[in-house]
Curated annotation (Swiss-Prot):
Function, in words: Usually encoded in the trnK tRNA gene intron. Probably assists in splicing its own and other chloroplast group II introns.
Database matches in PANTHER family: MATURASE K
Keyword Magnesium included in the entry's annotation: no
UniProt main location, coarse: plastid
Compartment annotation: Plastid, Chloroplast
Organism: Equisetum arvense (Field horsetail)
Protein name (database record): Maturase K
GO MF assignments: RNA binding
Protein family: Belongs to the intron maturase 2 family. MatK subfamily.
Keyword list, A-Z: Chloroplast, mRNA processing, Plastid, RNA-binding, tRNA processing
């Protein structure tokens, strides 16, 4: 559920009505406006009478929500109400559906405010678009020394989740209610194996991952590592400035020469994450492999109340090794350039190394995807897609059009375009074979009539219109 300006404005208006809004989040669940927002169905501002029948779908309505809220307000024994309500499956499903969505919105809005304050405090510059990953790595990772590849575990115990919430939320009533629904949902979804995963269909439980578990992890990583880098630079700045004292004092100079650590004032750590896969890169300093793992494990154990297996960590030297992320295989190579100095008598040749960032991807992954969808075989040979033969020619060409555009925009940041040319070849001939199978003709005839007008590369250069000219005229 995406936070919008309208939801934030509503959150501020409701918070003003609550007496202890700085300490308690539980009273926010008793405001009917939250359930209007969570259903993505807004009532006209001139008519805020929620007693009228406003149907959400075929089964639920806001009238049922109001009755449930009134019952909760008038209860003297919440435990008895929960037991009686759970006996009625219809009331239980409605209570879970709306109350969990309200919990989701309260947590999401609360975290949004906390994240904005955190970004200002630790000078966090974040980019939330997946399409900016390639350009970010090209620009920032070229000067990185070491890479930490981390896989966040998909599962978390409910009590560990409550402990994470307790660090930011001090409202005991809100925490008890959250604990009840988390344990209840865990018991219901044991057979379905949908507990605390990144599955988009599981909207009621993924809020714990998307908004608290990952947020707390990123918060500790950014804040603590920022403090570590600042202390690291200040403590080792003496090695870079006082060069005369090192030369005069042999003992100290020998000590400083034995330490090969050289730190830069612009030292920083770059962080990239997609779902449960995150990459951390150090720039301006070297960090021992065991120190990386020990530091992250301590954060996980003492702050997140979790234990992560060491095999989920892998450290690599970016100068020698490459890493895989989001279908890309990022690596760096040093290109040797010859520089000749100009002089009157002699012209010696001086060699200098220029670091150049190299982006490459393996051909296996796109071909596996195309083979799974039926566009080619395992070896990459194009085949016809029989399920599309019942569609019209325009629909077939438009479908291939969309697939090619998705591949191009995803892998468009590659320096070497060989992978794009291979995907283009597979899609073009798969499209031709599909049309040939539909018209019961040969690929050569279809290619001359229709596919000869295809110009994928030239169409992509257009700035205003990205529609490809796959089809001209109709062929019966």
């Amino acid at each position: 559920m995406k936070i919008t300006d309208k939801k934030l404005l509503l959150f501020e208006n409701i918070s003003k009505k609550v007496t202890y809004q700085q300490r308690f989040l539980y009273p926010l669940l008793f405001h009917k406006e939250f359930y209007v927002v969570t259903s993505d169905s807004f009532i006209d501002k001139s008519n805020m009478n929620l007693s009228k029948e406003f149907v959400l779908n075929d089964r639920y309505s806001f009238l049922v929500i109001r009755r449930l809220i009134n019952r909760i307000r008038n209860l003297n024994n919440s435990k008895k109400f929960i037991q009686t309500s759970l006996s009625d499956k219809s009331i239980c499903s409605k209570l879970d559906f709306y109350l969990l969505k309200a919990l989701n919105m309260v947590l999401e809005t609360f975290l949004l405010i906390q994240s904005e304050q955190t970004k200002k405090r630790v000078n966090w510059k974040s980019y939330k678009s997946i399409f900016s990953t390639c350009s970010f790595v090209e620009e920032k990772f070229i000067f990185s020394n070491q890479i930490l590849d981390l896989k966040i575990p998909h599962f978390i115990h409910p009590e560990s989740f409550i402990r994470i919430l307790r660090q930011q939320i001090k409202d005991a009533s809100f925490l008890h209610l959250t604990r009840f629904f988390v344990h209840e949902y865990k018991e219901r979804s044991k057979n379905e194996k949908l507990i605390y995963s990144f599955n988009k269909r599981n909207k009621f439980v993924t809020f714990s991952w998307n908004f608290f578990y990952i947020f707390e992890l990123e918060f500790f990583l950014t804040s603590l590592l920022t403090r570590f880098i600042n202390n690291l630079v200040l403590s080792n700045l003496f090695d870079q400035i006082n060069l005369l004292e090192k030369i005069n004092n042999n003992n100290k100079s020998q000590f400083f020469l034995s330490e090969k650590r050289i730190y830069n004032q612009n030292s920083c750590i770059h962080y990239v994450r997609y779902q449960n896969h995150c990459i951390m890169a150090s720039e301006g300093f070297y960090f021992h492999d065991t120190n990386w793992i020990y530091y992250i494990l301590n954060i996980w154990q003492f702050f997140m109340h979790l234990w992560i297996q060491p095999f989920r960590f892998s450290t690599k030297h970016f100068q020698k090794q490459s890493f895989f992320f989001l279908g890309y295989q990022f690596g760096r190579e040093s290109k040797l350039l010859k520089v000749r100095s100009i002089s009157l008598d002699k012209s010696p040749t001086i060699y200098s190394r220029l670091k150049k960032n190299l982006l490459k991807t393996q051909i296996v992954y796109p071909i596996d995807f195309l083979a799974k969808e039926g566009f080619c075989d395992i070896s990459g040979y194009p085949i016809s897609r029989s399920t599309w033969t019942t569609s019209t020619d325009e629909e077939i060409l438009l479908n291939f059009n969309k697939i090619w555009k998705s591949f191009y925009f995803y892998y468009g940041g590659l320096i070497k375009k060989d992978i794009l040319y291979r995907i283009k070849y597979i899609l073009r001939f798969s499209c031709a074979k599909t049309l040939a199978r539909k018209h019961k003709s040969t690929t050569r005839v279809v290619w001359k009539k229709i596919v000869s007008d295809l110009s994928l590369s030239s169409s992509l250069r257009r700035k205003k219109n990205f529609h490809f000219v796959f089809f001209q005229g109709s062929h019966g």
